[in-house]
Amino acid sequence: MLSITILFLLIAEVSSQNYTGNPVICLGHHAVSNGTMVKTLTDDQVEVVTAQELVESQHLPELCPSPLRLVDGQTCDIVNGALGSPGCDHLNGAEWDVFIERPTAVDTCYPFDVPDYQSIRSILANNGKFEFIAEEFQWNTVKQNGKSGACKRANVNDFFRRLNWLTKSDGNAYPLQNLTKVNNGDYARLYIWGVHHPSTDTEQTNLYKNNPGRVTVSTKTSQTSVVPNIGSRPLVRGQSGRISFYWTIVEPGDLIVFNTIGNLIAPRGHYKLNSQKKSTILNTAVPIGSCVSKCHTNRGSITTTKPFQNISRISIGDCPKYVKQGSLKLATGMRNIPEKATRGLFGAIAGFIENGWQGLIDGWYGFRHQNAEGTGTAADLKSTQAAIDQINGKLNRLIEKTNEKYHQIEKEFEQVEGRIQDLEKYVEDTKIDLWSYNAELLVALENQHTIDVTDSEMNKLFERVRRQLRENAEDKGNGCFEIFHQCDNNCIESIRNGTYDHDIYRDEAINNRFQIQGVKLTQGYKDIILWISFSISCFLLVALLLAFILWACQNGNIRCQICI
């Protein structure tokens, strides 16, 4: 009973203590109830006040025709457009930054193949324009303008608009053709020509008389010679024969020679190549809309200022880097330490060592004070601005470090080049893995710097106040100072703005500091004494209970029997 009485007396004594009257000023920083988790170099989960998402995961469900010029191939791919297939007439003279090939594009003329399809496709796409220059070719004693039922234009037999099918003359003659074209211009010329492969020997002689035929095309630096491959093939649009298309680039001052005794699909002119143009091609089913975006993917356009995206690895234009991560957050505020609901028994103010302040909305750092005139809170704009200046532009610097304007297009290969395709995919996957790792490391590094900077500014502000107050106040260890002289609101303001004069209050502070006072219990000591008192009370209660049991056993009131 004695111990319980002591416990209640201690609680009553502690509870009766009031604020000592000495002014207190605390330094703190902004906090929010729910911060954002970011990753740093040393910790995967650090809570900060604010952060910005760096990975774009949203895209438009359409392709934007501005500012990049888009040309929709519709039912035509770019090679059929260059050949002049029926249904591709809308591409005549077309000019583009991005040529849109549709997965539904189909061949609409005589069945053909291109042995080096990917190269000619890339050349045409990069050129950015179908600028065809017609030329006069003098073919002797042969019939020109051959047509096919597989190549209908307005339900009439026709052929590729940019090519001339040469067959034997009505007099059953196909003499040796040898024709030269000199490039006297100031640009490179692209000639597309072909070789017809009949399905039978009879077809060969009916069309060209000579069996076998031969086609040789030469420049000063190259020569391509093709002998037709006669043989039956599966019917495509009613045709068992095939055409193989080839291409030759003739530089200024060079010349091209066509030599044939049959089977030549001759050009009607050439395409002007623009070495300065850097256009490209995109294969997608996404429709063209009316939006504005500099970045296109096969899933749609992206409108963002974020440096990374995880929408598609296939992207064209001024696009964010593709990374595997779905989220990378850049810290744009300080470390978040949410404010406690209550502080000890009396709700005394506390500084940044214990927690942040959710009410500090005008700045990142600030002061709280308690004096005879009451309590107050004020932001410190100077330290706030110093931290903001170091963090501002962080996103721009991050974008500059990843500011490679590029397009990443999925490569297409013939089946025979499967090993090259596997190697290409491995290289691309490795590049993406590397970029993803670099992005994560770069963001973690910037986040570490942000947290270090904001912590440093808090410490600088604390040291500035400590140097001002010196022995006029005592550091309480929680980010607060207890001031040993009278300090009204004007005095508090002088501490905040750095104009506090230590010498004015020095004598008063020294007298108060060394004045003999009773024992003054701080909040931490009160809690300790309460726990000690509680422990002693429990111990005394147990001891009294044991003493009672022993006394009862001795008097025979309680019998204790132990069985083994």
Curated annotation (Swiss-Prot):
<feature type="glycosylation site" description="N-linked (GlcNAc...) asparagine; by host">
    <location>
        <position position="18"/>
    </location>
</feature>
<feature type="disulfide bond">
    <location>
        <begin position="109"/>
        <end position="151"/>
    </location>
</feature>
<keyword id="KW-1161">Viral attachment to host cell</keyword>
<keyword id="KW-1168">Fusion of virus membrane with host membrane</keyword>
<keyword id="KW-1160">Virus entry into host cell</keyword>
<keyword id="KW-0261">Viral envelope protein</keyword>
<keyword id="KW-0472">Membrane</keyword>
<feature type="disulfide bond">
    <location>
        <begin position="64"/>
        <end position="291"/>
    </location>
</feature>
<keyword id="KW-0812">Transmembrane</keyword>
<feature type="disulfide bond">
    <location>
        <begin position="487"/>
        <end position="491"/>
    </location>
</feature>
<keyword id="KW-0732">Signal</keyword>
<keyword id="KW-0449">Lipoprotein</keyword>
<dbReference type="GO" id="GO:0075512">
    <property type="term" value="P:clathrin-dependent endocytosis of virus by host cell"/>
</dbReference>
<dbReference type="GO" id="GO:0046761">
    <property type="term" value="P:viral budding from plasma membrane"/>
</dbReference>
<keyword id="KW-0564">Palmitate</keyword>
<keyword id="KW-1032">Host cell membrane</keyword>
<dbReference type="GO" id="GO:0039654">
    <property type="term" value="P:fusion of virus membrane with host endosome membrane"/>
</dbReference>
<dbReference type="InterPro" id="IPR013828">
    <property type="entry name" value="Hemagglutn_HA1_a/b_dom_sf"/>
</dbReference>
<keyword id="KW-1165">Clathrin-mediated endocytosis of virus by host</keyword>
<keyword id="KW-1164">Virus endocytosis by host</keyword>
<dbReference type="GO" id="GO:0046789">
    <property type="term" value="F:host cell surface receptor binding"/>
</dbReference>
<keyword id="KW-1015">Disulfide bond</keyword>
<feature type="lipid moiety-binding region" description="S-palmitoyl cysteine; by host">
    <location>
        <position position="563"/>
    </location>
</feature>
<dbReference type="GO" id="GO:0019062">
    <property type="term" value="P:virion attachment to host cell"/>
</dbReference>
<feature type="lipid moiety-binding region" description="S-palmitoyl cysteine; by host">
    <location>
        <position position="553"/>
    </location>
</feature>
<feature type="disulfide bond">
    <location>
        <begin position="295"/>
        <end position="319"/>
    </location>
</feature>
<feature type="glycosylation site" description="N-linked (GlcNAc...) asparagine; by host">
    <location>
        <position position="34"/>
    </location>
</feature>
<keyword id="KW-1167">Clathrin- and caveolin-independent endocytosis of virus by host</keyword>
<keyword id="KW-1133">Transmembrane helix</keyword>
<comment type="subunit">
    <text>Homotrimer of disulfide-linked HA1-HA2.</text>
</comment>
<feature type="transmembrane region" description="Helical">
    <location>
        <begin position="528"/>
        <end position="548"/>
    </location>
</feature>
<feature type="glycosylation site" description="N-linked (GlcNAc...) asparagine; by host">
    <location>
        <position position="178"/>
    </location>
</feature>
<feature type="disulfide bond" description="Interchain (between HA1 and HA2 chains)">
    <location>
        <begin position="26"/>
        <end position="480"/>
    </location>
</feature>
<feature type="site" description="Cleavage; by host">
    <location>
        <begin position="343"/>
        <end position="344"/>
    </location>
</feature>
<feature type="disulfide bond">
    <location>
        <begin position="76"/>
        <end position="88"/>
    </location>
</feature>
<dbReference type="GO" id="GO:0019064">
    <property type="term" value="P:fusion of virus membrane with host plasma membrane"/>
</dbReference>
<protein>
    <recommendedName>
        <fullName>Hemagglutinin</fullName>
    </recommendedName>
</protein>
<dbReference type="Pfam" id="PF00509">
    <property type="entry name" value="Hemagglutinin"/>
</dbReference>
<feature type="topological domain" description="Cytoplasmic">
    <location>
        <begin position="549"/>
        <end position="564"/>
    </location>
</feature>
<dbReference type="InterPro" id="IPR001364">
    <property type="entry name" value="Hemagglutn_influenz_A/B"/>
</dbReference>
<keyword id="KW-1043">Host membrane</keyword>
<keyword id="KW-0325">Glycoprotein</keyword>
